[in-house]
Amino acid sequence: MLAFVSLPFFFESVLHRSQVETGLLMTPWPLAVGIGAPIAGRLADSVSAAVLGAAGLVVLCVGLALLADLPENPTAAEIAWRMALCGLGFGFFQAPNNRSMLSAAPLARSGAAGGMLATARLTGQTIGAILAAISFRIGGHSETVALGMAAALAAIAAVASGARLYHPAGARPPKPAIVADAP
């Protein structure tokens, strides 16, 4: 969320793009999530969430770093492919990670697990917005600082996701859910 909050300010303040251009430049990210997440969801049946999540976060980290290091006066295409890379990475992280969290809960607690997932997501979005506001307060090229912070956080999260491989449950693909007949 830190990156997604700071990017419109980056496009307008640093790159001097109009509001319409900024809106269009934001579009490749969610489009790539829409492409990457279903693919990652299918792969999650045979590849562990730790591997997919770590790979997705590495791709997101690289995309954010490339956005923070854009050339002077970049073209829309130079921005768009970096945004798409971020979205693809985010989609590859989000789908298997959500599946892993929800499938780890007992069936009777699936509603609570969904609630916790939503709470964690909202907490992350809030912290991201706070970090963006703090970076804007710093001054200078604060939008670039925010993108750098987002890339660093994605790198840390990639390491944490990869560390799940060393946990017995994280080293193998999740088992398919078995729904028992109610008595």
Q: Where do the language-model regions lie?
A:
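12-transmembrane solute porter fold
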Residues: M1-R172
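Short, intrinsically disordered terminal tails adjacent to the first/last structured region
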Residues: P174-P183
